[in-house]
């Protein structure tokens, strides 16, 4: 597959568009089911590129109130989720790093940021249709699968959902 790009990954685009809305949704207590959020609007196109590890995304965002580029970068760098606030063992200390070089993030250089548990963002620039566009990079097996599962377990334990019998 070296030297080739596959322009379709079955089921990946639908999953990428719907799964975040389920995560950002809420649980209907009466029905006992997840009600997905209705915003933001997410659309994507997935392409398989031959790299060992890492998912790279071209992201386009529009805000209700457009921030400056500097404000956007400041908010990304300041982001702190429950895993950081609880200082969980697997949690990256700095969840998002912003790389100023115009040729970053790169899989070879940046996929292992924060032991693979962090997200690298670069090339933030204004867009003619949306407010901004940027490139994001995350480790698909560390952050996205194995490490993500460990971090979820740590969070559930810290929040009291997992206890000893």
Annotate each PLM feature.
Residues 1-3, 38-40, 92, 115-118, ...:
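Generic structural motif recognizing short loop/turn segments at the entrances and edges of beta-strands
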Residues 1-80:
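Active-site-lining helix/loop region of Rossmann-like oxidoreductase modules
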Residues 83-84, 100-165:
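C-terminal helical cap and adjacent loop that interface with cofactors, partners, or active-site loops
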